[in-house]
C-alpha cells in the first residue's frame, strides 16, 4: 500500500539525490502492517431535475438498502455481529468499543437491532449448514448450558470438519436435540453420530439406523476416575492401556497412508477387549435385590464396564472405520467457543438473543472452517 525509501541521510540534501534514487539498488525490505481506524461517511443526495425536453420533474431513487435518513453500513454491521459472537462481548461493551474506536454515537438499541437483523439475514444460510451436516457421513454432537433473561436454557451443537451449527432450546434432552434438526435427520446406516453416553442420544433414534461412535476422551476420563478414586482396579488400567494402544496404532497406519487396519490388529484388540470386560463383570457382580425401593446401585466400575460390553462397536469404531475420529473433539471445541461468550456476557438479553447469537456464530464458525 505504501513504500518508504530509506536512504542515506547525507544524500537527501544532495542536488543529485533524485538521479541516484532512480539508479539505487534494494538491499533489504522490512514491512510494518497496521490498520487505519477511521469511519467513512457517504452522503446520498437525492436530486430533482426539470426535464428541458418534456418539462417533467424527475427525481432520483435511493438504493434499496437506504431505508432511513441515517444508518450504518455493511462493514460496521459485520464488525458488531462479529464482536458479539466471536469476540464474546456484551452489547454494552460493543457500544463502548465502537463509539471509542470510530467516534460513533451508537446506542444499545442500535447494537441489538444490528445483531437481530444480521441473524435474520443469515437464517437461510444456516438452513444450508443444517442440511449439509445432516447429510455428512460423520457428525459430532454436544450441548452446554446457558442463561437468557434470567432463565436456564441449553445450547445444542452439531459439527463436522467443514460445518458448525448451533441452536438454543429451553430443554436439554429430546426436545432440544430434535429442535436443532440435525441428529434426528441422520437416518442412513452409513452415517455416524459421535457423542458421549448421554442417554437421549441413545434413545432418540427410533427407527433411524445411523451408527454411534463414542468419545474416547470421555471414556479415558471415566477410567482415570476409577483408577484415582475407586481403588485403582486392574480392569480400568488394562482397558485404558488397550484403548491407548489401539489409538496409537490407528494414528501410525493413517500416517503411512493406510485406510484400514489389518485383521490381526482388529482381532487382537477385540479379543483383549472382551477378555477385560468379562473379567471386570465377573469380579464386580450384579448387586442383589433388596427390600428397599428402587434398583440397587451397580457401582461405578460395573456400570462403566456394562457400557463397554453393550456398546463395543461404538467404542471401537475408530479402529474399524478410519473415517470416524476417536474423540468428540470437534463438538467439544464448538462448545468451548460458547462457554467463553457465556462467561463474559453471563446472560443473553431478550427472547431472541440466544437464537440470534446461534445464527451468527454458526455462520462465522462455518466460514472459518472453509478458510
Regions from the PLM with identified roles:
Residues 48-50, 55-370:
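Catalytic center-proximal scaffold of phosphoryl-transfer enzymes
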Amino acid at each position: 500500500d505504501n513504500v518508504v525509501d530509506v536512504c542515506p541521510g547525507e544524500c537527501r540534501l544532495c542536488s543529485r539525490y533524485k538521479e541516484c534514487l532512480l539508479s539505487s539498488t534494494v538491499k533489504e525490505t522490512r514491512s510494518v502492517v497496521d490498520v487505519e481506524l477511521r469511519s467513512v461517511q457517504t452522503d446520498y443526495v437525492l436530486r430533482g431535475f426539470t426535464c428541458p425536453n418534456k418539462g417533467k420533474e424527475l427525481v432520483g431513487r435511493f438504493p434499496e438498502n437506504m431505508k432511513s435518513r441515517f444508518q450504518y453500513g455493511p462493514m460496521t454491521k459485520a464488525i458488531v455481529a462479529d464482536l458479539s459472537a466471536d469476540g464474546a462481548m456484551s452489547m454494552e461493551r460493543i457500544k463502548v468499543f465502537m463509539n471509542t474506536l470510530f467516534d460513533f454515537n451508537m446506542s444499545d438499541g442500535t447494537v441489538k437491532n444490528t445483531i437481530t437483523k444480521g441473524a435474520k439475514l443469515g437464517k437461510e444460510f444456516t438452513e444450508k449448514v443444517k442440511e449439509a451436516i445432516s447429510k455428512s457421513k460423520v457428525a459430532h454432537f454436544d450441548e452446554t448450558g446457558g442463561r437468557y433473561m434470567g432463565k436456564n436454557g441449553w445450547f445444542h451443537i452439531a459439527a463436522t470438519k467443514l460445518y458448525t451449527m448451533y441452536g438454543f432450546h429451553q430443554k436439554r434432552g429430546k426436545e432440544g436435540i430434535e429442535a436443532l434438526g440435525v441428529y434426528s435427520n441422520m437416518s442412513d446406516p452409513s452415517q455416524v453420530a459421535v457423542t458421549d453416553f448421554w442417554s437421549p442420544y441413545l434413545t432418540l433414534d427410533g427407527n433411524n439406523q445411523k451408527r454411534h461412535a463414542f468419545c474416547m476422551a470421555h471414556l479415558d476420563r471415566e477410567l482415570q476416575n476409577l483408577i484415582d478414586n475407586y481403588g485403582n482396579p486392574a480392569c480400568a488400567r488394562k482397558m485404558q492401556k488397550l484403548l491407548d494402544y489401539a489409538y496409537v496404532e490407528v494414528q501410525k497406519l493413517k500416517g503411512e497412508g493406510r485406510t484400514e487396519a489389518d485383521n490381526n490388529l482388529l482381532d487382537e484388540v477385540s479379543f483383549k477387549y472382551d477378555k477385560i470386560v468379562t473379567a471386570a463383570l465377573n469380579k464386580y457382580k450384579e448387586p442383589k435385590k433388596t427390600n428397599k425401593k428402587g434398583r440397587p446401585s451397580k457401582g461405578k466400575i460395573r456400570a462403566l464396564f456394562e457400557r463397554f460390553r453393550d456398546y463395543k462397536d461404538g467404542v471401537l469404531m475408530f479402529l474399524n472405520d478410519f473415517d470416524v475420529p476417536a474423540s468428540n473433539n470437534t463438538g467439544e471445541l464448538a462448545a468451548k467457543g460458547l462457554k467463553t461468550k457465556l462467561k463474559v456476557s453471563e446472560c443473553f438479553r431478550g427472547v431472541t438473543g440466544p437464537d440470534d447469537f446461534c445464527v451468527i456464530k454458526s455462520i462465522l464458525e462455518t466460514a472459518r472452517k472453509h478458510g
